[in-house]
């Protein structure tokens, strides 16, 4: 990774670090589960990964703004992600390792 790339990605990495710090320190004290899937902190990490710092933070702020009794919650994926990405599935595996096709 070049120095230019490192500087470009630094704000995103700092934001992700703050989210991880929140998850390790403050979140366990709150105790109440998130009404959304994925959780707000997981949503924020995915938004930062896919959209970088500025757009990722904007999406996160919009998501946190939905957190209240006026919104029913539910599944709310980061734009441009799939359900597999939301579930953190790195790869879909095929149970048939023989290579035979069953037409």
Swiss-Prot record:
What's the chief localization of this chain? membrane
Subcellular location(s) per record: Cell inner membrane
Q: Name one GO cellular component term.
A: plasma membrane
Is-annotated flag, keyword Cell inner membrane? yes
User: What membrane topology term does the record carry?
Assistant: Peripheral membrane protein
Which Pfam families does the entry mention? YidD
Cystine crosslinks: none
Which keywords label this protein? Cell inner membrane, Cell membrane, Membrane
Establish whether keyword Cell membrane is in the entry: yes
The protein's job, in short, is: Could be involved in insertion of integral membrane proteins into the membrane.
What family does this belong to?
Belongs to the UPF0161 family.
Give the protein name, as stated in the record.
Putative membrane protein insertion efficiency factor
